[in-house]
Design a protein with these regions (language model features):
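Substrate/ligand-engaging "lid" and interaction regions
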Residues: 1-442
Length: 442
């Protein structure tokens, strides 16, 4: 059963197609193109809790209902103190979930085997921990509404419901407008809800505190279906792996490749110089900062490169460049610091990437006359304009690295040698061009 998170959405269209739709997976696997279309027929019905509140609450009365899986966006897991228990429904997702759970608790008289396994997929680090906090906040907020059932319900939720933290990893562009006619011809009817996604998928599920990994594997045996679902007792290393080996290289390859005359990620990976640079950053630098088994990291990094080289997706470098400084701060700076600590030297590839970001924010035009149009927080744009207006790369390097608004520290002082290396690379890019500057570190 699908429950719509917002008052207005796609429920009517989904029900209008008898809850049937297709998923078109495209990408590379073992170096070969993959393009499959599969009909999804596992949804029995779709509900709008704003217009079908009774039907929504009745879901909790089904004895075999065991899992709640959500994806309400990052803003969805939030506590709203204005929500009332008597709202039909509560305006927030955690509030609606508590309404559902309390009804189930009462309907089954607090039966221990009627708890729910809850798996949020929102892109928040340790999303399950945050959701659990919100649930407890609502339990306290609505304490008087629960009356004599307050203590019992709270104990039942704590002991018999299982809130997991998860990490989802799959690029889903959505409705394939560019080739929908071809897909509809292939499936022989008009599906207006086709979803396009890459073939790669990974779902890491951190078991709830009150259960074991073995218990969750038994209840949710996704591996038997051949799905890449990893059940663990700690999601953090996998979160760090994704941020470090997928998002990290993305952030630095984009300015380097764009300034080198390239426009899409796939072409960057296939470029003899930029492709070599990406592998240097990924395998020689960022991978060295993680503490998972080397074989596992190599496999993940290789999969990431296949994803970057997806022949079906033209991923524009300029779209990745949006908010590049905050992205570098969260995705690459931690690895730069760990690399320096472990190796005793600065990672040239990451520093070159940072220097390319700084150069990108100078604006202007590429050699082929393509405009360079940085997009970021106005404070960051203004700061870079001010620094570049000096015409002094030493002042640019020092000013950027001292910019507390981005780094929350003065990198000139906290990372020895970084200022000089950034200045050196800025000079190289200005005088030799991006590709020749890149050649100097490969």
């Amino acid at each position: 059963v699908v429950v719509q998170p917002l008052e207005h959405g796609m429920i009517d269209r989904l029900n209008g197609q008898d809850c049937l739709y297709h998923v078109n997976l495209q990408g590379k696997e073992n170096g070969k193109p993959v393009d499959t279309t599969t009909r999804i027929d596992v949804i029995s019905r779709a509900l709008n809790p704003y217009t079908q509140f009774e039907a929504f609450m009745a879901l909790s009365e089904q004895p075999d209902m065991r899992f709640v899986i959500s994806n309400t966006t990052e803003a969805g897991i939030a506590f709203d103190a204005t929500c009332k228990f008597t709202d039909r429904p509560a305006s927030s997702y955690p509030g609606r979930l508590v309404q559902l759970l309390f009804h189930r608790y009462q309907y089954f008289n607090g039966a221990h085997d009627k708890g729910m396994i809850i798996m949020p997929c929102e892109l928040i680090f340790l999303n399950g921990h945050r959701l659990k906090e919100c649930i407890y906040q609502y339990i306290e907020l609505w304490k008087e509404d629960f009356g004599n059932d307050y203590e019992g319900f709270k104990e039942w939720f704590t002991a018999d419901c299982y809130v997991c933290a998860t990490l989802v990893d799959r690029i889903v562009p959505g409705f394939p407008r560019e080739n929908i006619d071809e897909i509809q011809h292939k499936i022989c009817y008009k599906d207006n809800l086709v979803v396009k996604a890459e073939n790669f998928h990974l779902w890491v599920i951190e078991k709830a505190e009150n259960m074991t990994v073995a218990q969750l594997q038994e209840e949710f045996p996704a591996h038997k279906a051949g799905l890449h679902v990893l059940i663990t007792d700690n999601e953090k290393p996998y979160h760090m792996r994704k941020v470090t080996l997928l998002n990290g290289p993305h952030t630095v390859l984009s300015p380097v490749a764009f300034l080198g005359g390239i426009n899409i990620v796939r072409d960057a990976c296939e470029h003899p110089l930029v492709g070599k640079y990406i592998r240097k950053v990924q395998f020689d630098e960022l991978m060295q900062t993680l503490d998972l088994p080397e074989e596992e990291l190599n496999k993940f990094a290789t999969d990431v490169l296949e994803r970057f080289e997806n022949p079906f997706v033209d991923h524009q470098l300029t779209s990745i460049m949006l908010n590049a400084f905050p992205k570098f701060e969260t995705r690459d700076l931690p690895g730069l610091k760990i690399y320096l600590e472990r190796k005793g030297s600065l990672p040239q590839g990451l520093v070159m990437g940072l220097s390319a970001i700084i150069t990108y924010y100078k604006g202007g035009k590429r050699q082929d006359e393509t405009p360079i149009l940085p997009k970021d927080d106005p404070k960051i744009i203004e700061k870079l304009e001010e620094l570049w207006s000096t015409g002094d790369t030493r002042k640019v390097a020092e000013g950027v690295l001292a910019f507390d608004y981005v780094w929350h520290e003065d990198l000139n002082k906290t990372i020895p040698g970084l200022t000089d290396m950034v200045k050196e690379y800025l000079d190289l890019i200005q005088t030799k061009g991006m590709l020749e500057a890149l050649q100097s570190i490969l």
